[in-house]
Amino acid sequence: EMEGGKPGWYDALNGMPGMFGSSMAETYELARMLEYTIGALKRYPGELELIEEFSDFLQQLDLINASEKDAIGFCKKQSYAAKEEIQKEGEILSFWNQINDAKEAYREKVFSGISGVKNLVSTEKVVKILNDFLETVTCGIEKACILGNGICPTYFTYEVLEYEKVKDGYKPLKFMVREVPYFLEGPVRYLKLKTGKEKKAKLYEQVRH
């Protein structure tokens, strides 16, 4: 999700945040960070000292992720045969809205500072939470690759098909994903993931040809 400002190195895409643009480049890097953090926590088990605000935020995200498991866990139930199946599935707006509400509440809470209170959390618990996050992110990456016809994309834009008027403006109810021409940045970042040699070799051949 692009919230504003410049989306990256490519100045021609500066208007994408205004088109409900999203960048898969950050998604691939998020998956890498989750993989690294999970590995590090497993190597050094024990307890973590987290600021109260972040500890609460982490647990809230975990609850949202768990409550939306039926929707975002579709990748586990069956494999997608074609991108039409993903488009028919629709957007998981409930998950998106809840995650964004939690993010905005966290930002507002820490904007002027933190309480200074710290909570002890076991690395085992954090690893479980992060593994669940990684599963959700991986599912999203798999969907994106199918939408890209086997070549992992870098950017998407979204068209609002349905909306309702609310007090502060308009609330989107339904989106249509729009594909953007391929950028090499997407496949390059994807190749850094722990997806196995077979998938990477297949991607290489598709990009090459």
Segments from the language model and where they lie:
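Acidic, mature catalytic/reactive cores of soluble proteins
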Residues: 1-209
